[in-house]
Regions:
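N-terminal Rossmann-like FAD-binding beta1-loop-alpha1 element of flavoenzymes
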Residues: 6-30
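Conserved N-terminal/central alpha/beta ligand/cofactor-binding core
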Residues: 32, 36-129
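Core beta-strand elements of the Rossmann-like FAD/NAD(P) dinucleotide-binding domain
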Residues: 1-4
Length: 129
């Protein structure tokens, strides 16, 4: 019988992020109902949005998200996710994610995509989502 300190159910980005953190404190097992890459995170397309540019703000990102959500978003949840976004990007960088480098002295290429009024989408080639 296999044993672990932490059992993570799901191999998407949320589950694997937790597994990486939990691994600092004990043995981790990750299980999924299908193939390892047969999860929504692996099938997602596009990039990851975060306030990364000094010309952007949390308030602008929150407003864009609430507007695009057509009244269906929980404002406090949106605020929390947006405000924690830059920290999540820094953590991904520490884990070795190579976001596309920027031009003209920028650290990373930032794109403007649907629903966003500012450039805040980071890509890692075509693998992010």
């Amino acid at each position: 019988m296999k044993t672990s300190d932490f059992l993570v159910i799901g191999a998407g980005v949320a589950g694997l992020s937790f597994a990486l953190r939990a691994a600092e404190h004990g043995k981790v097992a990750v299980i999924t109902k299908g193939k390892f890459l047969d999860c929504s995170s692996a099938k997602a397309q596009g990039g990851i949005a975060a306030v990364w540019d000094r010309n952007d703000s949390f308030e602008d990102h929150i407003a864009d998200t609430l507007d695009a959500g057509a009244g269906l978003c929980n404002e406090q949840a949106v605020r929390t996710i947006v405000e924690e976004g830059p920290g999540a990007i820094r953590e991904l960088l520490e884990w070795g994610v190579n976001f596309d480098p920027g031009n003209q002295g920028e650290d990373y290429e930032l794109a403007r995509e649907g629903g966003h009024t500012k450039r805040r989408i980071l890509h890692a080639k075509d693998a992010t989502g």
